Design a protein with these regions (language model features):
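Conserved structural motif at the start of ABC-family nucleotide-binding domains
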Residues: 5, 20-22
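The feature captures the beta-strand-to-loop junction immediately N-terminal to the Walker
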Residues: 36-38
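Helix-to-loop junction immediately C-terminal to a conserved catalytic motif
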Residues: 51
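Conserved ABC ATPase signature
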Residues: 115-119, 123
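Hydrophobic anchor residue at the start of the ABC signature
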Residues: 129
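A short, proline-enriched helix->beta-strand linker immediately N-terminal to the Walker B motif
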Residues: 134-138
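Catalytic Walker B motif of ABC-type/P-loop ATPase nucleotide-binding domains
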Residues: 140-143
Length: 234
């Protein structure tokens, strides 16, 4: 696979110790990468750099042109219908038809003319995913998009995101605090701590993945230990 993202020596600070301390990162086309780390470890800062929302010096910073971000909050415009939110900023003549297809992909075609304030949390996040997909991103950036959802909705969203990734095949970077979520979805898991990557694990388990799988259990224990959490089954 070709490296879609290639970053060398990326550094970011805000007047104190470096949040990102000369890190190197590659993400291949179509690869699903999960990024774990404690609060304040720089995960969201890195995602913002990848999204072009923050500048940071680097020896090399190669990013694809087509990038989309889904944040923890859906950030829908309440005065626009769902479909108008999805097409916001899209200049193509066929924007409406592409948005309709994207809403169908996320299971929300029946709510395309609804107002955002009438959506459930899961529906609003589906709309945010459709808005990201309509731009046909080469790189999809997910900044803890399931954190505010209840447990059952989170599980459903995991399945949806995996299916969308399989269909559209963007490279994905998922920022999360949830080790199980990372193991369920990602090809590769990175741990960020002290401004550097301290752990990299490739996950070769077949999908659908089960947390009870011995290899998943081993990876979970290794990641929790790296994050300073004692595994419950240890």
């Amino acid at each position: 696979m070709t490296d879609l993202v290639d970053i060398r020596g990326l550094t970011r600070s805000f007047g104190g110790p470096a949040i990102l301390d000369g890190i190197d990162l590659t993400i291949a086309a179509g690869e699903f990468v999960a990024l774990l780390g404690r609060s304040g470890s720089g995960k969201s800062t890195l995602l913002r750099v990848l999204a072009g929302l923050d500048d940071a010096p680097a020896r090399q910073l190669r990013l694809p042109q087509r990038r989309s971000v889904v944040f923890q909050e859906p950030r829908l415009m309440p005065w626009k219908t769902v479909v108008d939110n999805v097409t916001l900023g899209v200049k193509r003549r066929d924007a409406r038809s592409i948005a309709t297809q994207a809403l169908e992909d996320v299971g929300l075609s029946h709510r395309q003319n609804a107002w955002p304030l009438t959506l459930s949390g899961g529906e609003a996040q589906r709309a945010a995913l459709a808005r990201a997909l309509v731009r046909e991103p080469e790189l999809l950036l997910l900044d803890e998009p399931f954190a505010a959802l209840d447990a059952l909705t989170r599980l459903r969203m995991h399945g949806l995101v995996f299916d969308l990734w399989q269909k559209h095949r963007p490279a994905v970077l998922l920022v999360t605090h949830d080790v199980g979520e990372a193991i369920t979805l990602a090809d590769r898991i990175l741990v960020l701590d002290g401004g550097r990557f301290t752990k990299e694990i490739r996950v070769s388990l077949d999908h659908p993945r089960r947390r009870s799988d011995p290899e998943a259990t081993r990876i979970e224990a290794e990641l929790l230990t790296e994050l300073g959490v004692e595994p419950l089954h240890a």
